[in-house]
Amino acid sequence: SVGFKAGVKDYRLTYYTPEYQTKNTDILAAFRVTPQPGVPAEEAGAAVAAESSTGTWTTVWTDGLTSLDRYKGRCYDIEPVPGEDNQFIAYVAYPLDLFEEGSVTNMFTSIVGNVFGFKALRALRLEDLRIPTAYIKTFQGPPHGIQVERDKLNKYGRPLLGCTIKPKLGLSAKNYGRAVYECLRGGLDFTKDDENVNSQPFMRWRDRFVFCAEAIYKAQAETGEIKGHYLNATAGTCEEMIKRAVFARELGVPIVMHDYLTGGFTANTTLAHYCRDNGLLLHIHRAMHAVIDRQKNHGMHFRVLAKALRMSGGDHIHAGTVVGKLEGEREITLGFVDLLRDDFIEKDRSRGIYFTQDWVSMPGVLPVASGGIHVWHMPALTDIFGDDAVLQFGGGTLGHPWGNAPGAVANRVALEACVQARNEGRDLAREGNEVIREACKWSP
């Protein structure tokens, strides 16, 4: 008979194109692919490219109505993973036309929306994305960025200090405000709502906002420094989230906060636009990230979530601590910390950076080191992160035997000592403990 036979077809015939020269408008992706036994690498790589772009499992007559060559994703390179016999990195190029402008949501729906459940693969992990400059320019990015934030806060030449208020659930609004005041008065720049503090029966959001604003103004008056508290605006609906941000703006506080993964990219981008229009800084917490990024061979690496956040918008984002972890992890973490802060980042596989990324002057995001850190980590943190970071000590402040304010003083004294030692040319990695011991004399 005339015509074609429909049937399950080999993807590699159409979607594996090793001779393809990538365009600088393409979105490039590096996938770590673990195929099912018996599935050749080229077929698995091509399947990923097809399923995340134009492909379907058979030939359909409407294929004739469009130009596949213009719209298809292409697997253009495959390389083995050293030390893993059943894994390889598949590089896929997507034409820019496949994506809606200014929508991180659509970018992820396209690239990772469907393909992760694909039968021919045992596991799939998105390791990195190269976002072309043409696509970046369709995003507003962070509401303000590192430089504007320093100008707003009038704080230069050192990392900023924060503290998450604990116990995170159960305090009344008034007592919560007291804890905020003590920390800010003692010398911290910021205090923080915990990521799961939204608006619960024991403390409704509006009461918390009011008492925290009072604490901020009182601490500012006493210290002569600009203070902030990350008021968590995360809510069940976008409307409610914006309502909370509006109230924060009416109180005149400098910064609000959002959980960008649980809240979702659409909500996050909405809030980021509101924050830029209204002069609010935006602190981003990455609650739920480990669900996506913890498995080594499946999911998405955090550097992809970090890039997505810079596009969607946020002025701070939690990025791990590095201290006390393995050396290799330090390089990888510093890799995505630079992806958040710098304007141009060279490809560097030793730091997990698969592609050179140019952010074309999109504002940078301050990485936040938080979780299990305390005063003795200060030299290492100052050494590793440099000035452009927020160091957050929760228990490391509130756990001080004399209380919150002395705990805050201790952190500030330690930080100032480390910055001064570094500026005087001392080696913090080697002499850190000594620097802290000297500083102890001036600290509660």
Curated annotation (Swiss-Prot):
Keywords: Calvin cycle, Carbon dioxide fixation, Chloroplast, Disulfide bond, Lyase, Magnesium, Metal-binding, Methylation, Monooxygenase, Oxidoreductase, Photorespiration, Photosynthesis, Plastid. The keyword Metal-binding applies. It is found in: Plastid, Chloroplast. The record marks K325 as: Transition state stabilizer. It comes from the Eukaryota. The modification N6,N6,N6-trimethyllysine is found at K5. CDD domains: RuBisCO_large_I. Binds 1 Mg(2+) ion per subunit. Mg(2+) binds at K192, D194, E195. It catalyses: 2 (2R)-3-phosphoglycerate + 2 H(+) = D-ribulose 1,5-bisphosphate + CO2 + H2O; D-ribulose 1,5-bisphosphate + O2 = 2-phosphoglycolate + (2R)-3-phosphoglycerate + 2 H(+). Transmembrane segments: none annotated. Its EC number is 4.1.1.39. The basic functional RuBisCO is composed of a large chain homodimer in a 'head-to-tail' conformation. In form I RuBisCO this homodimer is arranged in a barrel-like tetramer with the small subunits forming a tetrameric 'cap' on each end of the 'barrel'. HAMAP family: RuBisCO_L_type1 (MF_01338). Belongs to the RuBisCO large chain family. Type I subfamily. Heterohexadecamer of 8 large chains and 8 small chains; disulfide-linked. The disulfide link is formed within the large subunit homodimers. RuBisCO catalyzes two reactions: the carboxylation of D-ribulose 1,5-bisphosphate, the primary event in carbon dioxide fixation, as well as the oxidative fragmentation of the pentose substrate in the photorespiration process. Both reactions occur simultaneously and in competition at the same active site. This is Ribulose bisphosphate carboxylase large chain. It comes from Ephedra sinica. The lineage of its organism: Eukaryota, Viridiplantae, Streptophyta, Embryophyta, Tracheophyta. The gene is rbcL.
